[in-house]
Amino acid sequence: MSNIRALGAYRNALRATRVAFKTDLPVLMAARTQIKQGFVDNKDLADQEQQHEAIDKMNEVSQFLIKNIVQGEKQEGDKYFLNFHERTELGDNETIKQSKAEMGSLAGARAKKYSNIKK
């Protein structure tokens, strides 16, 4: 692998696991072990393109962990406290406002058919 880019991707991945799983030590350690194993498995890639693909994939995984993984802690009863952080990507809920027919789901397709029958 390209040493400098690979080392940067490795460090970013470790940072991402710390952000995503900081309160869950077993999951944090498992994620870091998985990342290390992935780098060990790919350390002998000879093809430059394969190296770049592996590094880019790891960078994408790191971004996904940071932006999309939120740990939750069970509170009393059936309540959970979600540990959002400043880099968590929050949706704008625009899809919730769309009708099912506009979203293109199977239910929407049936709803569209049903509305055509009614006319």
Swiss-Prot record:
GO biological-process terms attached to the record: mitochondrial respiratory chain complex III assembly
Identify the GO cellular component terms for this protein. Answer: mitochondrial matrix
- Give the record's keywords alphabetically: Chaperone, Mitochondrion, Transit peptide
Q: Name one GO molecular function term.
A: protein folding chaperone
Q: Which domain of life is it from?
A: Eukaryota
Q: Where is the transit peptide?
A: 1-14
Q: Where in the cell is it found?
A: Mitochondrion matrix
Q: Which InterPro entries match?
A: Complex1_LYR_LYRM7, MZM1/LYRM7
Keyword Nucleotide-binding assigned to the entry: answer is: no
- Function recorded in the entry: Assembly factor required for Rieske Fe-S protein RIP1 incorporation into the cytochrome b-c1 (CIII) complex. Functions as a chaperone, binding to this subunit within the mitochondrial matrix and stabilizing it prior to its translocation and insertion into the late CIII dimeric intermediate within the mitochondrial inner membrane. Modulates the mitochondrial matrix zinc pool.
Q: Which family does it belong to?
A: Belongs to the complex I LYR family. MZM1 subfamily.
Subunit note: Interacts with RIP1.
PANTHER family, alphabetized: COMPLEX III ASSEMBLY FACTOR LYRM7
Report the protein name in the record: Mitochondrial zinc maintenance protein 1, mitochondrial
Species assigned in the record: Debaryomyces hansenii (strain ATCC 36239 / CBS 767 / BCRC 21394 / JCM 1990 / NBRC 0083 / IGC 2968) (Yeast)
Q: What is the lineage of its organism?
A: Eukaryota, Fungi, Dikarya, Ascomycota, Saccharomycotina
Q: What is the name of the gene encoding this protein?
A: MZM1
